[in-house]
Amino acid sequence: MSRVAKAPVAIPAGVEVTLNEQTITVKGTKGSLTRVINSDVSVVVEDNEIKCSPVESAKTAAQAGTARALINNMVVGVTDGFVKKLQLVGVGYRAKLAGKDIDLTLGFSHPLVHKLPDGVTAECPSQTEIVLSGTDKQLIGQVAAEIRGYRPPEPYKGKGVRYADEQVRRKEAKKK
């Protein structure tokens, strides 16, 4: 069995977990998340813990580890939430909020407008920073990757949209 799947997920106080066949719902102070679990994995809720185990063969052990990690992310999301920070590096690169949209100026001939999905909130503490937050880790990472994808950091000057904790590997310019 997967080492990840062997560890049970602790259910903190104030979190309600509902298991209905292969659908798990986690409700907490920050919201509610629902996910369908693979049928190769059996999920059991007992003694304020969630345990995942593979149903049949060793081939499904990896699925059990994945299911356990997803459930843990749901529990952490509804209690603490997730935050992803982006930095805009470059002359004239700016971001500003307009309702549920982020207006981005990234050196193109036109401004870019990125619509935020439900469940993701954004803040712009400065013109060159974007802070995304919410309960669903996958959704926050997806939105951050889409925004970064408009102008990924380039290796020569380091300009572009990068994650706050990302190290951009720089290259030396060509010599004559």
Curated annotation (Swiss-Prot):
Residues 151-170 have a biased composition (Basic and acidic residues). This protein binds to the 23S rRNA, and is important in its secondary structure. It is located near the subunit interface in the base of the L7/L12 stalk, and near the tRNA binding site of the peptidyltransferase center. It comes from the Bacteria. One of its GO terms (molecular function) is structural constituent of ribosome. One of its GO terms (biological process) is cytoplasmic translation. The keyword RNA-binding applies. PANTHER family: 60S/50S RIBOSOMAL PROTEIN L6/L9, LARGE RIBOSOMAL SUBUNIT PROTEIN UL6M. Residues 151-176 are annotated as: Disordered. InterPro entries: Ribosomal_uL6-like, Ribosomal_uL6-like_a/b-dom_sf, Ribosomal_uL6_a/b-dom, Ribosomal_uL6_bac-type, Ribosomal_uL6_CS. PROSITE patterns: RIBOSOMAL_L6_1. Keywords: Ribonucleoprotein, Ribosomal protein, RNA-binding, rRNA-binding. This is Large ribosomal subunit protein uL6. One of its GO terms (cellular component) is cytosolic large ribosomal subunit. Part of the 50S ribosomal subunit. The gene is rplF. Belongs to the universal ribosomal protein uL6 family. The keyword Nucleotide-binding does not apply.
